Amino acid sequence: MTNQQKFDRLRKLLDEASVYARAVGKLEFDMQCCAPKDGMEQAGADMAVLSDRYFRLTHTKRYAQLVTELHADSDGLTQVQKKVIEHLYEAWEKEKNIPAKLNYEMSLAYNRAYSKWLEAKQAADFSMFSGALAEIISYTHQALDLREQKKPTYYDALLDDTEKGGSISQLDAFFDALRARIVPLVRRIQTEGKPIRTDFMSRPCPISQQEAFSKYLLELEGLDKEALVLMTTEHPFTTNFGPKDVRVTTHYYENNFVSNIFTTLHEGGHALFMQNEPEEFYREHAANSMTNGMHECLSLIHI
């Protein structure tokens, strides 16, 4: 069997697994944007079942064999396919020792935690969320302990997951350098800066007008409105289920319209990536594979 034939078989496995991943994502979107409070527990349970199915499909012996063999020898594959194998292998190495039961329990814990976090945030009472957070931390430590390639600390491992190569020492050096420039600048502004009018920024602005302006901003950024939806949530985010189904969220404050403007422009920046990635990326399961740093930094340029 050629390497291309192996990749074709792997793609079929990923095609099926991706159906479950999209289903989980759509349930999560609904839970964060429109699900009634009393329906969140059921949504979380449904998501855990679907996540378990995805996990099992990507942890079969056949899947592992294809990924490891193609990682060892990728001759004949396209550059995009080689990058896909690189990402899949890295994920496999991190997750291969996690039992399905632990993964299922982690999914349940994360889903339960969201509703707890929402209640705590709205009540401004951290104690309402602390128990759920402690449970998540415990499960995270269990999963990290199962990895064969260890990092100096749990936090180092999570930083590397978020941004490949990230570490505490790297960020300490970065923030030390940033602090050396930023602190003097802030002090200079405080002592020498001219007063700037800000009273208009808290002027009441009807939510309906903010929503209409948000839609205008998204069109101004060049987004395809027929492949886009705009909704509200407690903490804004952008997600997608292919280039033709991109979902942007924002949060309106009647007395802080500027917050929504910045949010919409930034989330619209994420949406631009999602709508414009090459079709090949989606076909070969390479979409959304850029680093978080790239996604966030370039999306912020639109503000």
Predicted regions and their residues:
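A well-structured
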Residues: M1-G166
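Short, extreme N-terminal leader segments that mark the start of a protein/domain
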Residues: M1-L10, N255, E280-F281, S289
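Short acidic (Asp/Glu) and glycine-rich catalytic loops that position anionic groups and cofactors
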Residues: V24-M31, L88-E90, G193-K194, K244, ...
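Contiguous, non-catalytic segments that form substrate-binding/exosite surfaces or channel walls
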Residues: M106-F257
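An N-terminal structural lobe/cap that precedes and organizes the functional/catalytic core
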Residues: S214, P243, T263, M274-A287
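Active-site recognition of the HExxH zinc-binding catalytic motif
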Residues: S259-P278, E296-S299
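Divalent-cation-assisted or electrostatically stabilized phosphate/pyrophosphate-binding catalytic cores
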Residues: A287-G293
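Conserved small/polar residues in nucleotide/adenosyl-binding loops
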Residues: I301-I303
